[in-house]
């Protein structure tokens, strides 16, 4: 896997390049398809609010360096459909009436399904720009959805604010089952710890893991001491099933996370549970927070 940093030259040249690249992309295949005689050509994206980087194969890292949360989202392309992993913090100025969709529309004409890593406010603020939304198929989420397919977000799930109040769920993605995008398959895996609904997208063929807020470049947030146990259970599963041939990508800060950080996370969680790590105390957003640090890995536990 490698990255190609997309640079923006002038608006006119960029628009011409986008038009050409989108046409070619419509006939291209995943970089993992050896039968393809016309390799996929990455699109140059114009945006004053985003840094867009191409990741082989057919994946775009969409960073929001100007957002207060430093969000990172991912657009994952197949041949027949695309997946938007998270929607962004929604703090940038609209372009053509949208904050994220105008970026996507420069890249692809494929139908796009939104799948959120979890429901916190900084991952769902552009949710209204998507007309097809998939949820991870967890029993309590299915039971909490109305007969019309509407899911209402709680204040706890959002953390801050009251938007979005609800969303229409169009598709349920079962755990550990291939989701066919056309020439490329992904899986959704439950990774509780940061939140109960936390999920990652795994491209097993291309060895890519998109992990949301479970692990990223920065202090990891645990909301309540009771979530330390599921956090540790999840990291045990990850270490056992995804070796260092997989590349790890998070939802904040620098997109790629060293795979070895999974073991560092395991070490600090054990240290906390065994009472060997001593926290410093602070207040954040009105919460009392225990801040732990071990070997460069930080875990902040928000006390309820």
Identify the residue ranges that each predicted region occupies.
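Bacterial N-terminal signal peptides that target proteins for export
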Residues: 1-9
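C-terminal motif of bacterial Sec signal peptides marking the signal peptidase cleavage site
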Residues: 16-19
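Accessory terminal helices/loops
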Residues: 24-44, 236-304
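Metallo-beta-lactamase
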Residues: 37-55, 82, 89-91, 135-192, 195, 204-205, ...
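Conserved beta-strand hairpin/beta-sheet module of binuclear metal-dependent hydrolase folds
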Residues: 48-106, 200-216
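Hydrophobic/aromatic beta-strand patches that form the interior of the parallel beta-sheet core
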Residues: 60, 113-115, 134, 171-173, ...
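Active-site HxH/HxHxD metal-binding segment of metal-dependent hydrolases
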Residues: 91-180, 267-274
């Amino acid at each position: 896997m490698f990255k190609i940093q997309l640079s923006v030259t002038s608006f006119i040249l960029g628009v011409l390049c986008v038009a050409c690249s989108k046409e070619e992309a419509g006939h291209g295949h995943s970089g993992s398809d050896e039968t393809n005689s016309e390799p996929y050509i990455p699109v140059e994206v114009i945006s004053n609010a985003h840094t867009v980087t191409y990741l082989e194969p057919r994946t775009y890292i969409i960073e929001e360096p100007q957002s207060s949360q430093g969000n990172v989202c991912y657009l994952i392309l197949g041949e027949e459909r695309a997946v938007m992993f998270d929607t962004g913090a929604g703090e940038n100025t609209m372009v053509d009436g949208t904050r994220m969709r105008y970026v996507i529309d420069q890249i692809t004409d494929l139908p796009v399904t939104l799948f959120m890593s979890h429901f916190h406010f900084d991952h769902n603020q552009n949710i209204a720009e998507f007309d097809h939304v998939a949820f991870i198929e967890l029993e309590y989420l299915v039971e909490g959805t109305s007969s019309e397919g509407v899911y209402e977000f709680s204040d706890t799930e959002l953390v801050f604010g009251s938007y979005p109040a609800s969303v229409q769920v169009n598709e349920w993605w079962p755990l550990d089952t291939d989701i066919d995008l056309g020439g490329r398959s992904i899986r959704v895996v439950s990774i509780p710890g940061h939140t109960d609904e936390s999920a990652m997208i795994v491209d097993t063929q291309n060895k890519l893991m998109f992990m949301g807020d479970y692990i990223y470049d920065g202090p990891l947030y645990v909301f309540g001491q009771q979530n330390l146990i599921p956090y540790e259970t999840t990291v045990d599963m990850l270490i056992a099933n995804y070796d260092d041939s997989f590349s790890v990508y998070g939802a904040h800060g620098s997109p790629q996370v060293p795979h070895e950080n999974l073991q560092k996370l395991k070490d600090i969680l054990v240290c906390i549970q065994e009472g060997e790590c001593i926290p410093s105390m602070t207040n954040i957003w009105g919460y009392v927070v225990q801040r732990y640090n071990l070997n460069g890995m930080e875990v902040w536990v928000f006390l309820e």
